[in-house]
């Protein structure tokens, strides 16, 4: 349970209600009313329950409904959502007249994660008060939760930080400084100072505890904060100056049978010990509550939560300039604050605020929100942190350590309403691109160099491994240009864009480099039968060839076409010559300068020599075998057709690498 400093505010809101119940002279009910009026919700819940059980369901229906409503409110204040839901349902069953019973039933059901029944309760309440913004936001939150549960699972990893947790409430963790080796938090463990239980929560009053990492980076056993911090009162919810020498803490003091004062105090550190806290004066207003301090990373501001006048309802987040206090008090405005409660601020950066709220649409109870301040310092953009950071219960008091990891507090899954500390981690989204650099025979290219340039300004270079493989680490949502090359080979360029998905991804791209010193077959160039007309399916291969020439602007080539051995030699020379020229004509039309291109038809005069790649595809042909006429005549009819197909090819040969250089 959290230090709830809304006691004073709540007492005034429920004064009329207590007048009605006060008309009953039953001593036990009068005792319950008095406990409730002082904010002693734990004690009052027990007394109200005893009164409720003795009232007749038939004769005392009206009073039973009123007591059930009060009992529901006690349970709600104790964060015991299932008990609160049952009590409010009893109040409605006994026709309790205040429509707020439906509103609070909706809140309690939402805190249980029963979203559809919660929507129904909110809608019933809106029949009485159709303009109520909190009820509307409650419905929005329920719908958001239903949609989120059906959607993609978040990458966040959330675990119970068992070392820090006791059998009572443990919450609001905070690192001491940038070293991240010491963490402080608030606890109502049985080891807390003092002997008396809190009449408000039924547990011991909270103290400040801490844990330190050992030389192996493991957290040590938690101990009470050293020095004069912990007393018989409630202390906790701390923040620290950037140098870790000043602690800001919340102190709730209560005299017997009296109201509770909630204020911010400061303490100074000397070695490992803390001085006796001194009150931090914010205003002269002594009726309002001030708590949940959060120092900004640059030490300029102290953010805090308060129900002081001038807010937007409930408790708001404010800030005060620590260097110029006079006249610097500032409400963070309606983008942050709502008609509900905004509490537990935490500044990760001077323009990045985290806080808990039950006024913005959420999953139930308090939700954690992230807010960015724009470049002009005039507007906050607020975002719910979503599942699994948020739950149907109370989620609050976050702090960040290294990267996207840290701790926060939640009472999720605890029917008693006790808070516990959880760790969280958002694993880095790993985006990579990998592939191979091979030659036309699909063999690794030695010492190939791959460069990758992103429109985010990144520029990486890597030498392919001996097997031709490479791998780069990338960022999400970036356009990249990659170029692969090696001595004795033409460069190849490829472009792509990584997407924005928050998922690991490994893009794959291979580079096939053409060697300069020998002819290179151009795959997938097709002609009409017995003609030089290029078929439409050749376009992709021809366009890739044009791009290769653009990527290698100092290269000139000869296009060569080859035929099988059917037909006369003269006929085949003529056909292949026309086919080679057709390719050159296409490249010129694609923007390649004509003086970089020549062509020649070889007919059947240069039969293909079997390469490793051809051997893998046609194992019947041994590597280095020349597919000439004498060899082909020894083959079966089927293998002869395969050999003819291999011989029918279009190739290019680099003729110069110095074009237009001088």
Predicted segment positions?
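Periplasmic OmpA-like peptidoglycan-binding domain that tethers envelope proteins to the cell wall
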Residues: 357, 361-364, 562-662
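Structured interaction patches on ligand/partner-binding surfaces of diverse proteins
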Residues: 487-510
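Short, solvent-exposed beta-strand/turn patches at coil↔beta or beta↔helix junctions
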Residues: 515-555, 563-570, 635-656
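A short, amphipathic beta-strand motif
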Residues: 32, 431-440, 468, 511
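A short, solvent-exposed beta-strand micro-motif common in secreted/extracellular proteins
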Residues: 478-489
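Short, acidic Ser/Thr/Gly-rich low-complexity loop/linker segments typical of extracellular
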Residues: 455-469
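Short, conserved micro-motifs composed of acidic
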Residues: 38, 42, 81, 101-104, ...
């Amino acid at each position: 349970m959290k230090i709830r400093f809304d006691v004073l505010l709540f007492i005034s809101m429920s004064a009329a209600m207590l007048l009605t119940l006060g008309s009953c002279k039953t001593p036990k009910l009068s005792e319950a009313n008095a406990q409730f009026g002082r904010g002693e919700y734990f004690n009052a819940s027990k007394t109200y329950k005893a009164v409720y059980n003795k009232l007749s369901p038939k004769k005392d229906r009206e009073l039973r409904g009123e007591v059930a409503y009060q009992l529901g409110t006690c349970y709600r204040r104790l964060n015991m959502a299932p008990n609160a839901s049952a009590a409010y349902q009893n109040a409605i069953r006994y026709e309790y007249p205040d429509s707020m019973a439906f509103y609070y039933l909706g809140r309690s059901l939402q805190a249980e994660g029963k979203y559809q029944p919660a929507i129904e309760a909110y809608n019933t309440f809106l029949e009485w008060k159709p303009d109520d913004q909190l009820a509307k936001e409650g419905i929005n939150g329920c719908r958001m939760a239903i949609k989120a549960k059906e959607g993609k699972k978040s990458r966040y990893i959330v675990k119970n930080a068992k070392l820090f947790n006791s059998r009572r409430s443990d919450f609001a963790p905070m690192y001491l400084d940038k070293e991240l080796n010491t963490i402080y938090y608030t606890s109502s463990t049985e080891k807390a100072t003092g002997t008396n239980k809190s009449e408000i929560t039924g547990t011991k009053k909270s103290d400040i505890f801490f844990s330190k990492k050992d030389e192996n980076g493991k957290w040590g056993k938690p101990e009470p904060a050293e020095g004069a911090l912990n007393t018989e009162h409630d202390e906790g919810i701390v923040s620290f100056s950037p140098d870790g020498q000043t602690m800001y803490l919340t102190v709730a003091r209560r005299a017997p049978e009296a109201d509770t004062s909630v204020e911010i105090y400061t303490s100074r550190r000397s070695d490992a010990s803390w001085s006796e806290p001194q009150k931090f004066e914010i205003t002269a207003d002594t009726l309002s509550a001030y708590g949940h301090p959060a120092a900004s990373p640059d030490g300029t501001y102290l953010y805090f939560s308060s129900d002081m006048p001038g807010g937007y309802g409930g408790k708001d987040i404010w800030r005060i300039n620590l260097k110029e206090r006079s006249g610097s008090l500032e409400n963070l405005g309606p983008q942050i604050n709502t008609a509900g409660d905004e509490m537990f601020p935490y500044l990760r950066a001077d323009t990045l605020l985290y806080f808990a709220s039950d006024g913005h649409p959420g999953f139930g109870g308090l939700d954690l929100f992230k807010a960015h301040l724009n470049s002009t310092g005039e507007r906050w953009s607020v975002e719910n942190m979503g599942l699994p950071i948020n739950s149907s219960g109370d989620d609050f008091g976050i702090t960040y350590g290294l990267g996207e990891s840290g701790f926060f507090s939640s009472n999720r899954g605890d029917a008693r309403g006790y808070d516990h500390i959880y760790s969280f981690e958002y694993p880095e989204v790993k985006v990579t691109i990998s592939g191979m650099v091979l030659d036309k025979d699909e063999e690794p290219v030695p010492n190939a160099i791959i460069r990758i340039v992103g429109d985010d300004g990144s520029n990486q270079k890597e030498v392919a491994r001996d097997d031709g493989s490479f791998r780069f680490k990338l960022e999400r949502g970036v356009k990249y240009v990659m170029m692969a090359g090696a001595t004795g080979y033409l460069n190849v360029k490829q472009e792509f864009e990584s997407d924005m998905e928050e998922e690991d991804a490994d893009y794959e791209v291979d580079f096939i480099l053409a060697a300069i010193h020998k002819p290179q077959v151009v795959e997938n160039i097709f002609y009409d039968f017995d003609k030089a007309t290029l078929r439409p399916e050749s376009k992709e291969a021809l366009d890739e060839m044009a791009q290769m020439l653009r990527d290698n602007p100092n290269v000139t080539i000869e296009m060569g076409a080859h035929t099988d051995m059917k037909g006369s030699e003269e006929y085949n020379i003529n056909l292949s010559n026309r086919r080679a020229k057709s390719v050159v004509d296409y490249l010129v039309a694609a923007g390649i300068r004509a003086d970089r291109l020549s062509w020649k038809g070889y007919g059947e005069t240069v039969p293909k020599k079997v390469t490793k790649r051809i051997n893998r595809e046609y194992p019947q042909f041994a590597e280095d075998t020349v597919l000439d006429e004498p060899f082909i005549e020894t083959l079966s009819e089927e293998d002869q057709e395969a050999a003819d197909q291999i011989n029918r090819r279009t190739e290019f040969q680099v003729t110069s690498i110095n074009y237009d250089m001088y």
